[in-house]
A protein has these predicted regions:
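Short, small-residue-biased leader/transition segments that mark boundaries at the very start
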Residues: 1-2
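A short, local hydrophobic-aromatic micro-motif
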Residues: 6-11, 99
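Short, charge-patterned binding micro-sites
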Residues: 9-35
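Flexible, gly/pro- and Lys/Arg-enriched active-site loops
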Residues: 18-27, 41-134
């Protein structure tokens, strides 16, 4: 359970090939929108706690993982620290992020590029979408 937060929307699940050169089974991707009282760093700590409860061990960057919970947007906040960058780095080039996100909030504008989620998905080069879905 996510502390001091409430899930508002949940996307359909999307099975894709592993990303980042990881040798493991296909990924199952999804997105959820929450309303939270947590600050960004607190939210990240809560997400890491949930990952650990589900057996995630962070031994290798881009290594195999049982669960990977990321903050993609936090309203229209632009934020950067040693542990967290919002909006999520390179999310506009990741089909497995944009596809489920477009189900929840297609008209949300990226606070840096000012493009909507639907625009970013439509503008993805074919080579980033082909072969993504398993």
């Amino acid at each position: 359970m996510l502390f001091r937060s409430r899930v508002e929307k949940v996307s359909e699940l999307l099975e894709t090939l592993p990303y980042g050169g990881v040798e493991q089974n296909n990924f199952v991707n999804g997105m959820f929108e929450i309303r939270t009282l947590l600050a960004p760093e607190e939210l990240l700590q809560e997400l890491h706690r949930i990952e650990q409860m589900e057996g995630r061990e962070r031994k290798i960057h881009w290594g195999p993982r049982t669960l990977d919970l990321d903050i993609i947007f936090y309203d229209d906040l632009i934020y950067s620290s040693e542990d967290l960058v919002i909006p999520h780095v390179d999310m506009e080039n990741r089909y497995f992020v944009l596809k489920p996100l477009s189900e929840l909030t297609p008209n949300f504008r990226h606070p840096i590029t000012h493009k909507t989620v639907a625009q970013m998905l439509a503008e993805l080069p074919v080579d980033l979408t082909e072969g993504s879905e398993a």
